[in-house]
């Protein structure tokens, strides 16, 4: 095998090498069935066992909270932006959103197409470089739910705690930091995540929802846009992305092997601290974008003195085997995405490269 790249892509992102190797070993002949998991009927016992195991394993990692269902949906988190207000925003209610950056903005944009919305808090005034404090969040009396993006991948800002919304369901877009740390699922009515950052390959969207919220979806909605379709049919109403779900299950096993969410969080903090220290101790050569208290452990954003120098950095990094360090096109700059599967060794190599680049250009 050729040398693995130092993969800092924002998504699709690095997958654990051990998971890729296990999948490779089982790719043609899954558990001596003479078939790949991709060739099996989704109604068959072998695939259904994988499907059910992935659901159970995910809830177990979250402490087995009662009254929640795991759904596997297609269409990415972007489809959830619309499904959420379609299912939960009733006549006379308002959808409340915390505005923290690019992804929160997209979620709000979709909700506005469905019904009335309210910005409960916003960090737009800081150019999304600091997150609103929890006590600044103001819900309307007729709030249907509060939607919050736990981690903004583009800006690089992450909530470290979540608001108590009382009887108003809290809905979390956790696409880029789900299972990167422990959190109390009981605070949420629903969380969702596209798989392609911390859970597996693209093509699967995981939704974890409180069962009482989805007992019955609005009757006027199309079948595949109703949450109760997935609940009542165990996400098997139509053909699911079976290989993606198999991969999610393998990634969940890998997380278990690393000490669960506590073990993964410890590893992630160590990686993030290493890179942030390199930025903060560079004498201003590298400048972190986000206020320290709002910094993400998943997406580290930083700048150099000029766009020209940043282009040089990206070009030089690619020559050394680094991938994905260019910032998002909407904000520019530089970004290192260090999701669960990115090894500490890759972060060490990045810090060494940053130091070398600083010496040669500083």
UniProtKB/Swiss-Prot annotation:
Thermal denaturation midpoint (Tm) is 71 degrees Celsius at pH 6 and is lowered around 58 degrees Celsius at pH 8.5 and 10. One of its GO terms (molecular function) is O-phospho-L-serine:2-oxoglutarate aminotransferase activity. PROSITE patterns: AA_TRANSFER_CLASS_5. Binds 1 pyridoxal phosphate per subunit. Its EC number is 2.6.1.52. This is Phosphoserine aminotransferase. One of its GO terms (biological process) is L-serine biosynthetic process. The lineage of its organism: Bacteria, Bacillati, Bacillota, Bacilli, Bacillales. The keyword Cytoplasm applies. Optimum pH is 9.0. At pH 9.5, retains more 60% of its maximum activity. Inactive below pH 6. It comes from Niallia circulans (Bacillus circulans). Pathway: Amino-acid biosynthesis; L-serine biosynthesis; L-serine from 3-phospho-D-glycerate: step 2/3; Cofactor biosynthesis; pyridoxine 5'-phosphate biosynthesis; pyridoxine 5'-phosphate from D-erythrose 4-phosphate: step 3/5. Its cofactor is pyridoxal 5'-phosphate.
């Amino acid at each position: 095998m050729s040398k693995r790249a130092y993969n800092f892509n924002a998504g699709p992102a690095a997958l654990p090498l051990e998971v890729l190797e296990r999948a490779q070993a089982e790719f043609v002949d899954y558990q001596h069935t003479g078939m790949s998991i991709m060739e099996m009927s989704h109604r068959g016992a072998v695939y259904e066992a994988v499907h059910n195991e992935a659901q159970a394993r995910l809830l177990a990692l979250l402490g087995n909270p009662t009254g929640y269902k795991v759904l596997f949906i297609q269409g990415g988190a972007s489809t959830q932006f619309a499904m959420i207000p379609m299912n939960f925003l009733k006549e006379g209610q308002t959808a409340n959103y915390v505005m923290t950056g690019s992804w929160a903005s997209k979620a709000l944009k979709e909700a506005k197409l469905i019904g009335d919305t309210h910005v409960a808090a916003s960090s737009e005034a800081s150019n999304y470089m600091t997150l609103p404090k929890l006590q600044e969040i103001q819900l309307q009396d007729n709030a249907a739910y509060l939607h919050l993006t736990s981690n903004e991948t583009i800006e690089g800002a992450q909530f470290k705690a979540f608001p108590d919304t009382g009887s108003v369901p809290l809905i979390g877009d956790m696409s880029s930091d789900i299972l990167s740390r422990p959190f109390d699922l009981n605070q949420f009515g629903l969380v969702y995540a596209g798989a392609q950052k911390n859970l597996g390959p693209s093509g699967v969207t995981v939704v974890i929802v409180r069962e009482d919220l989805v007992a019955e979806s609005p009757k006027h909605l199309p079948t595949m846009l109703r949450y109760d379709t997935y609940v009542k049919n165990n996400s098997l109403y139509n053909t699911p992305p079976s290989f993606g779900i198999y991969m999610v299950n393998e990634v969940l096993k890998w997380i278990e092997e690393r000490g669960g969410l506590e073990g993964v969080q410890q590893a992630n903090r160590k990686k993030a601290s290493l890179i942030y220290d390199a930025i903060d101790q560079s004498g201003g050569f590298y400048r972190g974008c986000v206020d320290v208290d709002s910094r993400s452990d998943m997406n580290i954003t930083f700048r150099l003195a000029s766009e020209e120098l940043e282009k040089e950095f990206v070009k030089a990094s690619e020559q050394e085997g680094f991938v994905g360090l260019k910032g998002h096109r909407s904000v520019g700059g530089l970004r290192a995405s260090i999701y669960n599967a990115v090894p500490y060794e890759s972060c060490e190599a990045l810090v060494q490269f940053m130091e070398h680049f600083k010496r040669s250009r500083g």
